[in-house]
Swiss-Prot record:
Stated family: Belongs to the frog skin active peptide (FSAP) family. Dermaseptin subfamily.
Protein name: Raniseptin-2
Residue span(s) of the pro-peptide: 23-49
Keywords: Amphibian defense peptide, Antibiotic, Antimicrobial, Cleavage on pair of basic residues, Secreted, Signal
Keyword Signal: yes
Bilayer-spanning residue ranges: none
Region (Disordered): 27-46
Cell compartments where the protein resides: Secreted
Signal peptide: 1-22
Entry's Gene Ontology BP terms: defense response to bacterium
Main location: secreted
């Protein structure tokens, strides 16, 4: 009878340890998924910021180009 009790306790103990390890791995996996989602969100925000800067730079380049063309035409045709 004592042998059966010890065996039963051993099985229950190993089952509980196994269950706690699985739960811990599950929590770690969920935390990693959350971290990846946050990183994706940050990268999306960074992409939006970069696009905004590129749009501003593009429009600034257009303005500078028009001014340069106007200045060049003024110096090439000073009579106007």
């Amino acid at each position: 009878m004592a042998f059966l009790k010890k065996s039963l306790f051993l099985v229950l103990f190993l089952g509980i340890v196994s269950l706690s390890i699985c739960e811990e791995e599950k929590r770690v996996g969920e935390e990693e998924e959350k971290q990846e989602e946050e990183n994706e969100e940050l990268s999306e925000e960074e992409l939006r910021e970069r696009r905004a800067w590129l749009d501003k730079l593009k429009s600034l380049g257009k303005v500078v180009g028009k001014v340069a063309i106007g200045v060049a035409q003024h110096y090439l045709n000073p009579q106007q």
